[in-house]
Structure formats: C-alpha cells, structure tokens
Amino acid sequence: MYSFMGGGLFCAWVGTILLVVATATDHWMQYRLSGSFAHQGLWRYCLGNKCFLQTESIAYWNATRAFMILSALCATSGIIMGVLAFAQQSTFTRLSRPFSAGIMFFASTLFVLLALAIYTGVTVSFLGRRFGDWRFSWSYILGWVALLMTFFAGIFYMCAYRMHECRRLSTPR
C-alpha cells in the first residue's frame, strides 16, 4: 500500500510542478509575425524580446486559465490528502484519505484535459490559420505531461485504497 502511495506522491509532485510551470510560462505557441519570432502563453504574448500582457477578455483564454488553475488547486489538495494518508489511523473508516487523494488527482486530470482541449481546438481552428507558420511550444507540452502525471497519481492512490480495503475486509473482527 505504501509503495503505491509513494509512487502516487512522486507523480503528484512532478505533475503539480509541471502544471504551475505550464500555467505561468509564455511558451504555449510559437509563430512568426512580420518576419520575427513571437510566442504566447495564457497571460502574455512576446514579440521579439518585448512581452505584453493579454488584456483582451477572450473566452477561450479565460476558460483555459480557469481550468489550469483549478487543476493545480485540485492537485495541491490531492498532495495534502496524499501526505496525510501516510498517517491515517484505522479509526477513520468513513473517509479514506488515499481514495480522496485519488479522486482529487482525477479531478485535476479532468480540468487539465478540458484546458488543453479548449486551447488546442481554438488554436488549430482559428489561430493556426491566422499565423500560418506556427507550432505548439514547450509550455503546452508540459501541460500534457502534467496530465499524464496527475492521472497516474490518481491510479496509484486508487490502487493503494483498493489494497487497503482488501486487507481491511480480509482481517477477522
């Protein structure tokens, strides 16, 4: 059980760090504009060496930002529950901390999937046609890696929960 929780905690830490870095950085998309390279993130866009805040309130950016922030919050609360699961006493039979941590990591996975799906759909259908020579960049890719890490953290914690439940049910009372 503890090895599953340890693996889940490792995946959760890495996934949460990647979520925060992906959300905060400006390299979701790179493109060429007026002969010079440019890149943009969820909060700023940069032309050459100058960066500007994205002040326009565009729905897909707002949705992507919100889902990325929700994902990071769920992953952080999952880490807290996951750490507390190591100290779980047998008196807490109603609320299983490994199960709760797993649910939080799956919620984080869902939110980051929604954020990346929205960003991908709008970028490919609208921005990709507008800029011509463009590509997704490393911040965007970190988001996909974070999705995998939070998903596997959820899997590990659900396996730990299942293993604990099987042991609890098999011991005589």
Curated annotation (Swiss-Prot):
Question: What GO biological process, any one, is recorded here?
Answer: lens development in camera-type eye
Q: Does the keyword Isomerase apply?
A: no
Q: Where in the cell is it found?
A: Membrane
Query: Which is one GO molecular function term here?
Result: structural constituent of eye lens
Residues modified as Phosphoserine: S170
Extracellular face: residue ranges? 25-66, 120-140
Q: Which GO terms describe its cellular component?
A: plasma membrane; vesicle
Give the way it sits in the membrane. Multi-pass membrane protein
Principal location: membrane
List UniProt keywords, sorted A-Z.
Answer: Disulfide bond, Eye lens protein, Glycoprotein, Membrane, Phosphoprotein, Transmembrane, Transmembrane helix
Q: Which residues are glycosylated?
A: W43, W61, N62
**Transmembrane helix: is it a keyword of this entry?**
yes
Q: Which residues lie on this side of the membrane: Cytoplasmic?
A: 1-3, 88-98, 162-173
Quaternary structure, from the entry: Seems to be associated with itself or another lens membrane component via disulfide bonds.
Q: Which family does it belong to?
A: Belongs to the PMP-22/EMP/MP20 family.
Q: What is this protein called?
A: Lens fiber membrane intrinsic protein
Q: What taxonomic ancestry is recorded? A: Eukaryota, Metazoa, Chordata, Craniata, Vertebrata
